[in-house]
Amino acid sequence: MLKTYKLLTGSVTYLMVEYERDLKKILIWLLGGSRGGLMRLKILLLLKKRPMNPNQLARVLNVNYRTVIYHLELLERYGLVNKLDIGYGAPYFISDKLEKRWDLIRDVMRILGINEREEMEEGGEP
């Protein structure tokens, strides 16, 4: 998933720059460079507002439940969302890692020419 870097200089800053560069690349691929990227972005934008379970997301986005599950599992695999519980209907929320670096989402949206407000209007709001 993410590369591991040796710190030859002992500088933590170097590690953070490389980590953020990798995170930005991952976001560009997940949100713009692969099929379903726009759906994943809409899911992230909704979860940024409040935690939601897959059924709620499917209803708001007007898509199949399995479609939402597929995208949530992918986002979870890359550490961008977390599930509150293991059970059915458990809510998902934005991970701390992504919450702290939400500016990268905005950067990626700018790179891809996506307007956050327009996406929320198209995808619906809870």
Give residue ranges: language-model regions.
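Amphipathic alpha-helical dimerization/coiled-coil segments
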Residues: T4-L27, D96-P126
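Short helix-coil-helix linker/hinge
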Residues: G32-R40, E99
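Short, Lys/Arg-rich nucleic-acid/phosphate-binding segment
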Residues: G37, D85-P91
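Short capping segments at the starts of secondary-structure elements
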Residues: L38, K49-N53
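Pre-recognition alpha-helix immediately N-terminal to the DNA-recognition helix
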Residues: L41-L45
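A short acidic, leucine-rich amphipathic alpha-helix
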Residues: Q56-V60
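Glycine-centered, phosphate/nucleic-acid-interacting loop/turn motifs that mediate DNA/RNA or nucleotide
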Residues: G79
